[in-house]
């Protein structure tokens, strides 16, 4: 953000004009700043060759996720809606991790059908359900197991 002609602006667009057009409160994203942040983030972790997953529960803006996907990011999703949205926004299924408690059979089935990278299981019953559905579909599924030592 910077002042242009005494008006606070984002990428040469005056914030007051955004407020007039879209009302307040509003969220504004700078695609230029987003790209710069992504490039810097990836550069700083380059030696580790990580697969970076954006947490879609933190922001479900499809345009934002589509932009992030252009840089090879994956997605960490917690519902079938987020999973569908991530795929629609251009995230490759093999770069999607499905976390979250209480996944339904329908959600697990859809995740397996889409051949996502990993399903994080939150309970013994969820592990059994993933196994049951995977066997029915004759598919191998990568499963992460979350443990709480307490």
Show where each model-derived region lies.
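Flexible glycine-/small-residue-enriched beta->alpha junction loops
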Residues: 142-150
